[in-house]
Amino acid sequence: MKVLVLGAGVAGVSSAWYLAEAGHEVTVIDRAEGVAMETSFANAGQLSYGYTTPWAAPGIPTKALKWLFKSHPPLLFRPDGSLYQIEWLWQMLQNCTAAHYQTNKERMVRISEYSREMFRRFEAQTGMNFEGRKKGTLQIFRQTKEVEAAKQDIAVLERYGVPYRRLKPEECAEFEPALARVTAKIAGGLHLPADATGDCRLFTENLYKLCQEKGVRFHFNQNISRIDHNGLRIKTVETETGRFEADAVVCALGCFSRTVLAQLDLNLPIYPVKGYSLTLPVTNSDGAPVSTVLDESYKVAITRFDNRIRVGGMAELSGYEIKLPEKRRETLALVVNDLFPEGGDLSQASFWSGLRPMTPDSTPLIGRTRFDNLFLNTGHGTLGWTMSLGSAKLTADIVSGKDTEIRSDDLSLSRYQA
């Protein structure tokens, strides 16, 4: 079967890999000049299987209001002038009940744990290097009230069987030795040993090469202008420079899935949530992180690659703009300099922003649409890297008409159309 994948980020390229593995003739198109040029370019680098949790949770509306008044807020809301922004926020607020949280959490954990297994199989199969590390996540708390608040998170970890260890301030240095220099700034910690890290862009670039070896064709600089269909069947996808026919189409366009598929009267509940990152060279390995550290106060993650440190986080609801305000850079620089002052060179740091495709219930859209041959693999929010291989394998199995290895019937767009 000929399958056309829309999007060459980690979701699209991973989908292409599993579709090719299943024996399909696969073509990938993207508007960028290469793979992983947008949301997958410089994310925080965390494979956060243990930290898979919905944004929409009980108590979040109150927390969000408090964050807005902080000097370095982890969440920022800027009206984009659209009614849709308000509608999306309202849908998210409706998911902030305990019942919805539990349903959404179960779905997300299911995908993330499956993705963990897919990464295990993939690495055993390919031996790919993407600067990955399996040394866990260390969440640090700067205030006693954060330590107390974490008890609710720990209860969730226990409910879903996620291994963890609570840490006293001085014990944090067991996992991140450089933090011994700043123990006085830490009130406690939480270590999740089963989490991992890796460079999403490097992974996607290497997977692109493996896909090519399997015969997958890539066409870049392709802006989609029109999708033609005959009844409930997609016939062709037209770009400004070409026309592509396929037996099946997979949409993995991240935030732009909504705008591209709007012409088909498909209403995808995806909103772009902007995030930021700094990438700086390691200057002193002993003063740099070993794995990934999540600063609970600032909602910022600091992740170690081979010779680089990635500092990423924050969430901004401001539409599709990707400006780089100096204030956000200052927040990232403040956090990494406060915890790892001797680790890297901020004067050589590169500053980046990207748009995460977030759904109101934080769960991605995977599977069928009302069109017989149009499938989705999009809307992963901040967990696109974590869920990438699991989501892609699910998508490939659904396209192929195979039984999926985990439940997938509640992941499709239909849950918003009931």
Swiss-Prot record:
Matches recorded under Gene3D superfamilies: D-Amino Acid Oxidase, subunit A, domain 2, FAD/NAD(P)-binding domain
InterPro entries from the UniProt entry: DadA (IPR023080), FAD-dep_OxRdtase (IPR006076), FAD/NAD-bd_sf (IPR036188)
Molecular-function GO terms, alphabetical: D-amino-acid dehydrogenase activity
Keyword Oxidoreductase: yes
Cofactor(s) required, per the database record: FAD
Known EC number: 1.4.99.-
Function, as annotated: Oxidative deamination of D-amino acids.
Protein name stated in the entry: D-amino acid dehydrogenase
Classification lineage: Bacteria, Pseudomonadati, Pseudomonadota, Betaproteobacteria, Neisseriales
Chain's gene name: dadA
